[in-house]
């Protein structure tokens, strides 16, 4: 038996393969961005990277190091059937500082994979709506991949007071801000996926639901546990 992924409650765990290795994602909600999508947040953080490794004093998310990693690099490690089910959604994003000048304008960037905003983790602001699951500090804590070591992870929100700074979630789940070139903070990608994906009817022994089938399933076949595109 299987059921729609949209039927899962917030906080449920779903396994997605990254380069053929199962990783855990947290169900955050359904239709949050108005595209009939489900939003999944990676349970663990991914490596260390700067918010903006190229330009100090430039805390703009659009096209920066963090944005490029999420929407270009991270997507490529997912199984092809999951990539085919990604949904472009409008993520509210504050412009930030450009060459020292602050712009509070919030624009909707179209993204399939992205970093959450300070507003979306319950810290207030105009760049998004909070996910209820992330309203408590404990639920915001992320760990280095497959470890019990809590890490700092970047949000996409720039800080208005300092052109060098952007917001992040600390190891205790609180929200703070720091310099955009800090390379020892982590990315924690969120995915927007089709709500038509079917998952297992119950969680497995690790407490996770697994992908049973997907809208693009007619193009793919599972070979040795990995989804492969059939020509």
Q: What residue ranges belong to the model's regions?
A:
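Collagenous Gly-X-Y triple-helix signature in extracellular proteins
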Residues: 1-231
């Amino acid at each position: 038996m299987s059921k729609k992924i949209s039927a899962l409650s917030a906080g449920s765990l779903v396994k997605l393969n990254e380069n053929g290795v199962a990783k855990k994602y947290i169900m955050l909600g359904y239709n949050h961005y108005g595209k009939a999508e489900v939003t999944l947040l990676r349970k663990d953080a991914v490596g260390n990277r700067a918010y903006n490794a190229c330009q100090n004093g430039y805390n703009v998310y659009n096209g920066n190091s963090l944005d490029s990693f999420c929407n270009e690099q991270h997507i490529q490690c997912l199984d092809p059937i999951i990539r085919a089910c990604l949904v472009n959604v409008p993520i509210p994003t504050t412009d930030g500082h450009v060459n020292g000048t602050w712009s509070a304008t919030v624009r909707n960037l179209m993204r399939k994979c992205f970093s959450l905003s300070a507003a979306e983790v319950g810290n207030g602001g105009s760049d998004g709506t909070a996910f209820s699951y992330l309203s408590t500090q404990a639920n915001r804590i992320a760990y280095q991949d497959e470890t019990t070591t809590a890490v700092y992870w970047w949000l996409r929100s720039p800080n208005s007071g300092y052109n060098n700074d952007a917001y992040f979630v600390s190891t205790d789940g609180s929200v703070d801000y720091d310099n955009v070139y800090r390379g020892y903070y982590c990315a924690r990608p969120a995915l927007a996926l089709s709500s038509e994906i079917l998952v297992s009817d119950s969680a497995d022994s690790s407490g996770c639901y697994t992908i049973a089938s997907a809208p693009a399933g007619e193009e793919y076949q599972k070979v040795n546990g990995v989804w492969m595109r059939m020509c």
